[in-house]
Regions:
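N-terminal, polar/charged subdomain of small-to-medium soluble alpha/beta proteins
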Residues: 1-94, 108-112, 116-161
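Short glycine-rich or small-residue beta-strand-to-loop segments that form or flank ligand, phosphate
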Residues: 94-101
Length: 161
């Protein structure tokens, strides 16, 4: 399985990253990508930008640990997680989670699992910049609830259908 985990300030090309994952591969039958963008509005307030901070070293290690958990749960052939940090303007890409498998079910489930983890447990902190000033963003109850569905015993890995 190919795995790419990157934390970076620079923007990245989502299509190029997906193409890199599948280049020369004939065993991949499904690729699921999730791309998170900086919205221009937060609770009715126009957003100029977000500033994302992370714990260097720990963030990469924690993401890698959850990628390994996803591999144990689903028959994955590739995973890419790229997360930006620093100041990110409205409309810019923040995060990419891409998963590849022989079949779509595993790719969809793994991408959802990894994104739920990134939203709730990864060591990132988000500050929003609006015309009213800046404020740190608290975790959302809905994100925690979404992540809870993965806390039970994972289903037995099924052979490719």
């Amino acid at each position: 399985m190919t795995t790419t985990i990157r934390l970076q300030r620079e923007a990245f090309d989502v299509a190029a990253e997906a193409a890199r994952m599948t280049h020369g591969r004939t065993d991949i039958g499904a690729v699921v990508t999730f791309t998170g963008l900086c919205r221009a509005d937060e609770n009715g307030q126009p957003i100029a930008a977000l500033t994302l901070e992370h714990y260097p070293g720990m963030a990469e290690a924690e993401i890698a640990r959850h990628v390994e958990e996803a591999r144990a749960r689903w028959p994955l052939l590739g995973v890419t997680v790229i997360h930006r940090y620093g100041r990110i303007a409205a409309g810019e890409v923040i995060v990419l989670v891409a998963t590849a498998s022989s079949h779509r079910e595993a790719a969809f489930a793994a991408a959802s699992f990894l994104m739920d983890y990134l939203k709730t447990r990864a060591p990132f902190w988000k500050q929003v910049e609006t015309v009213a000033g800046t404020a740190w963003v608290d975790a959302k109850v809905a994100d925690d609830a979404a992540a809870e569905r993965w806390s039970g015993k994972p289903p037995e890995r099924e052979a490719a259908k």
